[in-house]
C-alpha cells in the first residue's frame, strides 16, 4: 500500500507505530526531557522494527512531525508452504501473495503454520507480515 500519515511527536504513545529509517516500527518507550530554560522539549523514541525486529531509537523535538504507517490488518488462508516462503490467499479479495518466511512470519507462529489454516496478516508500506493464527470464527 505505501500509505503513511504525519503525526506530532507529542501525540505518540508506547504500543503505537512509527516509521524510522523507512522501517515501520512499534514504539516501546518514549522519554520526554526538557533541555532547560530555552529550547523545546525533546522526545527520545525507542521502537522495534515490525519486519526485522531491530531496536531503533530517534530523538526529536516534541513539536516535530513524524511519519506513521497505516497498517491494514486482514485475514488470509495458507495455501502452500515451501522451505523459504509461505503462499497465502486473502479471504476478501482472493489475491495470493508469496511471503518470505524469515522476514514475513512472526517467530512465535513459524512452527505452527500449515496449509489450510487462517492467519492474520498485516500489510504496510508495500510489505506483508503474517502476525498470528486465527481461530475458528474469528
Curated annotation (Swiss-Prot):
It is found in: Cytoplasm. Its main location: cytoplasm. One of its GO terms (biological process) is positive regulation of translational termination. Coiled coil: none annotated. One of its GO terms (cellular component) is cytoplasm. One of its GO terms (molecular function) is translation elongation factor activity. InterPro entries: IF5A-like, IF5A-like_N, NA-bd_OB-fold, Rib_uL2_dom2, Trans_elong_IF5A_hypusine_site, Transl_elong_IF5A_arc, Transl_elong_IF5A_C, Translation_prot_SH3-like_sf. The modification Hypusine is found at residue 37. Keywords: Cytoplasm, Hypusine, Initiation factor, Protein biosynthesis. Disulfide bonds: none annotated. Belongs to the eIF-5A family. Functions by promoting the formation of the first peptide bond. This is Translation initiation factor 5A. It comes from Pyrococcus horikoshii (strain ATCC 700860 / DSM 12428 / JCM 9974 / NBRC 100139 / OT-3).
Amino acid at each position: 500500500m505505501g500509505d503513511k500519515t504525519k503525526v506530532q511527536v507529542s501525540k505518540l504513545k508506547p504500543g503505537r507505530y512509527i516509521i524510522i529509517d523507512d522501517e515501520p516500527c512499534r514504539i516501546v518507550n518514549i522519554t520526554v526531557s526538557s533541555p532547560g530554560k530555552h529550547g523545546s522539549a525533546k522526545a527520545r523514541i525507542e521502537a522495534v522494527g515490525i519486519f526485522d525486529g531491530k531496536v531503533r531509537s530517534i530523538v526529536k523535538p516534541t513539536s516535530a512531525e513524524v511519519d506513521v504507517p497505516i497498517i491494514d490488518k486482514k485475514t488470509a488462508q495458507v495455501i502452500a508452504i515451501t522451505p523459504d516462503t509461505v503462499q497465502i490467499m486473502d479471504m476478501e479479495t482472493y489475491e495470493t501473495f508469496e511471503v518470505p518466511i524469515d522476514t514475513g512470519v512472526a517467530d512465535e507462529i513459524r512452527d505452527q503454520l500449515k496449509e489450510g489454516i487462517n492467519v492474520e496478516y498485516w500489510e504496510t508500506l508495500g510489505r506483508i507480515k503474517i502476525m498470528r493464527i486465527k481461530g475458528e470464527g474469528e
